[in-house]
Each structure stands twice: as C-alpha cells, then as structure tokens.
Amino acid sequence: MQNDWQEFKEFFIYIFLFIDKANVESIIMWNLTQNEYLTLMVGVWVVILFLTWFFLWMVFKIVGYFK
C-alpha cells in the first residue's frame, strides 16, 4: 500500500507540476502524509487558478483601454 502511494504521488507530481526531475525527487523526499499532500495539491491548484484569473483580468483590462 505504501509503495502504491509513492507511485501515485510521483504520478500526480509529474502530471500537475510540470517541473524537472530533480525538483520532483526533492518533493517526493518530503514524506508527506496523504492528507498533507492533498492539501498541498489543492493549495497549488488554487494559486494556479488565481494567477490565471488575475492574468486574464489584467489582459482584458488592458485591451479595454484600447477600444
């Protein structure tokens, strides 16, 4: 079960965080529990979604000035 969890964690880190192998291995070595890991992933996604929304809002605001 623990080994499955490690593989699951690696898979999600590779899929959701497009980062190089060294960073992935350092995150895997943190030995987070499932709860902590899920909280971290949710936090990362909230930040990504907020930054995306903010970026799009800024683009539309800037485009609005030129209309």
Swiss-Prot record:
InterPro entries given in the database record: Phage_1-C74_Orf10
Topology term for the membrane: Multi-pass membrane protein
Keyword Metal-binding (UniProt): no
Location(s), subcellular: Host membrane
One Gene Ontology cellular component annotation held by this UniProt entry: membrane
Transmembrane domains' residue ranges: 10-30, 40-60
Keywords associated with the record: Host membrane, Membrane, Transmembrane, Transmembrane helix
Family per record: Belongs to the plectrovirus ORF10 family.
Protein name, UniProt field: Uncharacterized protein ORF10
Lineage of the organism: Viruses, Monodnaviria, Loebvirae, Hofneiviricota, Faserviricetes
